[in-house]
């Protein structure tokens, strides 16, 4: 009987810990929504809140017009763990802070360790935005051999023409795969459809007219309360139909 009681207490404690963690992760997502980071879209996986799907749209600088998909992996004890969240791109991305082998983004220069209550995921995404807007400025004061991709850093500093050419290859590749079949059946995976006038035209017209709220049920309501991750891209362009 005592053993059963102890087991129940452990189960209850684990359940409470899990619920508390879920609320903290939800709070992180709400903060990201409130920050309205331009060109970055993320959503937690439906199946696992420690895994997030994201897309980065380059709006300026060398990476303008890029559409890079990435995954965020949170530590098991996030946000209490001092371990850093991981950002992993789904394709080759040449950048001094991106490992050419694992495609992971090194965030340790901005976040030596994760400080619960002080560091937040929106700051991590803002860092991603900043280092792609100005990659050269992002490596100032850092020794080249301390960077994840020292070859990219050398090119950026000494052969910018070649660096730009390789960035353009990455951008071209990202656009070629934007409409690929999702690698997962997770309903929160961010999906893009080619522009269809009969389906997406009315939405575009409302946006052009400056209407911030649509009268039709949202994608989330139409799916029984679950977000589908669906988005739309105008044909010939790679910008989501949003008010931004």
Swiss-Prot record:
CDD domains reported in the protein's UniProt record: UEV_AKTIP (cd23814)
Tell me which GO cellular component terms the UniProt record holds.
Answer: chromosome; nucleolus
SS bonds (residue pairs): none
Extract the SMART domains matched here: UBCc
Q: Which Pfam families match?
A: UQ_con
Q: Keywords on this record?
A: Chromosome, DNA replication, Nucleus
The answer to keyword Phosphoprotein applying to this record is: no
Bilayer-crossing residues are none
The UniProt entry, under Gene3D superfamilies, shows: Ubiquitin Conjugating Enzyme
| Subcellular localization(s) per the UniProt record | Nucleus, Nucleolus; Chromosome
A GO biological process of this protein is: sperm individualization
Q: Which residue intervals define the domain UBC core in the entry?
A: 20-176
What is the reported phenotype of gene knockout?
Embryonic lethal. Hypomorphic mutants are late larval/pupal lethal and display frequent telomeric fusions in larval mitotic brain cells. Unlike other telomeric fusion mutants these fusion events preferentially occur between heterochromatin-associated telomeres.
Q: Does the keyword Lipid metabolism apply?
A: no
Superkingdom to which the source organism belongs: Eukaryota
As for family, the record states: Belongs to the ubiquitin-conjugating enzyme family. FTS subfamily.
Q: Function, please?
A: Required for efficient DNA replication, probably through involvement in telomere replication. May have a role in telomere capping of heterochromatic chromosome ends.
PANTHER family, per the entry: UBIQUITIN-CONJUGATING ENZYME E2
Additional remark text: Multiple telomeric fusions result in multicentric linear chromosomes that resemble little trains of chromosomes, hence the name 'pendolino', the name of an Italian train.
Q: How does it assemble?
A: Interacts (via N-terminus) with cav/HOAP (via N-terminus); the interaction is direct. Probably interacts (via N-terminus and UBC domain) with ver and moi.
Protein name stated in the entry: Protein pendolino
Question: Lineage in the entry?
Answer: Eukaryota, Metazoa, Ecdysozoa, Arthropoda, Hexapoda
Q: What gene, per UniProt, encodes this protein?
A: peo
